[in-house]
Amino acid sequence: AEKIKICLQKQVNSSFSLHNGFGGNLYATEEKRMFELVKPKAGASVLNQSTWIGFGDSRTDKSNSAFPRSADVSAKTADKFRSLSGGSLMLSMFGPPGKVDYLYQGCGKHKVFYEGVNWSPHAAINCYRKNWTDIKLNFQKNIYELASQSHCMSLVNALDKTIPLQATAGVAKNCNNSFLKNPALYTQEVNPSEEICGKEYLAFFTLPTQFGTYECKLHLVASCYFIYDSKEVYNKRGCDNYFQVIYDSYGKVVGGLDNRVSPYTGNSGDTPTMQCDMLQLKPGRYSVRSSPRFLLMPERSYCFDMKEKGLVTAVQSIWGKGRESDHAVDQAYLSTPGCMLIQKQKPYIGEADDHHGDQEMRELLSGLDYEARCISQSGWVNETSPFTEEYLLPPKFGRCPLAAKEESIPKIPDGLLIPTSGTDTTVTKPKSRIFGIDDLIIGLFFVAIVEAGIGGYLLGSRKESGGGVTKESAEKGFEKIGNDIQILRSSTNIAIEKLNDRISHDEQAIRDLTLEIENARSEALLGELGIIRALLVGNISIGLQESLWELASEITNRAGDLAVEVSPGCWVIDNNICDQSCQNFIFKFNETAPVPTIPPLDTKIDLQSDPFYWGSSLGLAITTPISLAALVISGIAICRTK
């Protein structure tokens, strides 16, 4: 009789690379990074399509006769905007004669403002003031600030009021022989003489707690008054000084000008200029007192419910060639914390005409058609990778990637995978379940700055019955990491709060601190990914070894008395009793695959974040996969020895 020895043998050559893991190592034909770097797309986007609203003009007005050529947004996005061609929030606030007057109102956690160009130097609105840019800047700034703290907002276009019986609605020659709708001008007579004295006016207006279905917790009110260069310009008879003052219900001054206590400008002009300050006032009854001859009466406001903090995106609104624009929207953005600005890099060139349908703006606003994982001043991201090449400029919201270098991202094995352990490690089934991917899927792995010793938490103890990290030791390691991270995170947050109090006046210091924190988080996350990578490698290696054990057991069962297992993964067979076809049945399974390979492991990593905590990531969870392809035992060959 001729006896031969047949063994399982790993086929590994120089094309394989070695990967070390916690509890087991393996060879692989390929490798890939756990994540690729993502690049933000320039422009605006939203985190949730169902929770945003836009406020616009002709460039977002679906009812415009030239739509869609006149628009800078898609038809889908235009449906989300409250728009009317020729309108703007400020035009509706003041109501200058001959201009569009639109009732702006709506609700959304994220508000996108693409309007403002219709009140610009090109509009040439006078009404006792030729340049309204500084008032527009203050108006837009207050709108953005209050919108960021509210879910709903609405124009209140008719305040309840009580005015003196002798007052008459006034007009002005330099206001197209009319006047603004807000404030309204009331006079003792049409075109009152500068020589009239008389008694002071006393009037009242009420800011409502509700306007239609809109709740009002705070109102934006324009407190307007005239600025005179001298007392003689105000009244040639000099019978009194000019004043126009607003009082709350307790008699406290909340706005206006009183030349009885404040000096005149001292300039040489003979025509007054109207100034309008923006006041944030609570609902209630207010009084207005003014010197004789006329009264400027608040007639409108913007109402805000102040129910929740939200996101504000301001889009630069400028004319095309031949029309003068201002930069009030851009400057208001700079003055409003948490506000994002979408800004053109090229002149506005329209498709429908010079001022409607700009291709660059369409590209910048195309992201409003989608939901992003992260929105920031640098742009928006919808890929799932936690890393980007460049630091994303704040403000940023959502699950925002952290800056990292490509070479610092850990690599995982791919392609054909072979465990490094010999077949002796596959003979005995492990007595206790090895810590595996299912355990990783269950938990949330908090990311923070871990000072030292993190690897030692996970090494655990090796078992003679198969090796690797036991479930119990790994769980204890993760529990220790979690506790340490929570303590460190809590201490860090307390320190940040204290530091913010000290440097709240220093915006650059805050930005520097934010950058340092994000860099630390990026380093910590990369460190945690390295640990997870090592766990995955070990887990895969163990899984492959178990498949080898199943293969060896199946061979022994099929052989019966025809083959004797003389060592782990090796059998002796009588060549005269078991011919080639017999051996093919036992060892090659008649060229079939009777033992299923281990299923692909799902190892997709998903960042969980708090959108209002520095805009960066707070947690890490393992979910469903980058498939680790080809986890097979096809690299196992049969080696014959005589």
Swiss-Prot record:
It is found in: Virion membrane; Host cell membrane. Residues 138-297 are annotated as: N-acetyl-9-O-acetylneuraminic acid binding. Its EC number is 3.1.1.53. Disulfide bonds join C7-C570, C107-C152, C127-C175, C197-C239, C216-C303, C224-C276. Residues 639-642 are cytoplasmic. Keywords: Disulfide bond, Fusion of virus membrane with host endosomal membrane, Fusion of virus membrane with host membrane, Glycoprotein, Hemagglutinin, Host cell membrane, Host membrane, Host-virus interaction, Hydrolase, Membrane, Signal, Transmembrane, Transmembrane helix, Viral attachment to host cell, Viral envelope protein, Viral penetration into host cytoplasm, Virion, Virus entry into host cell. The keyword Iron-sulfur does not apply. The keyword Disulfide bond applies. One of its GO terms (molecular function) is sialate 9-O-acetylesterase activity. Residues 28-138 are annotated as: Esterase domain-1. Residues 298-352 are annotated as: Esterase domain-2. Residues 1 form the signal peptide. It is an enzyme of class 3 (hydrolase). One of its GO terms (cellular component) is viral envelope. Residues 353-638 are annotated as: Fusion domain-2. In natural infection, inactive HEF is matured into HEF1 and HEF2 outside the cell by one or more trypsin-like, arginine-specific endoprotease. It is a single-pass type I membrane protein. The chain crosses the membrane at residues 618-638. Homotrimer of disulfide-linked HEF1-HEF2. Binds to the N-acetyl-9-O-acetylneuraminic acid residues on the cell surface, bringing about the attachment of the virus particle to the cell. Plays a major role in the determination of host range restriction and virulence. Class I viral fusion protein. Responsible for penetration of the virus into the cell cytoplasm by mediating the fusion of the membrane of the endocytosed virus particle with the endosomal membrane. Low pH in endosomes induce an irreversible conformational change in HEF2, releasing the fusion hydrophobic peptide. Several trimers are required to form a competent fusion pore. This is Hemagglutinin-esterase-fusion glycoprotein. It comes from Influenza C virus (strain C/Yamagata/10/1981).
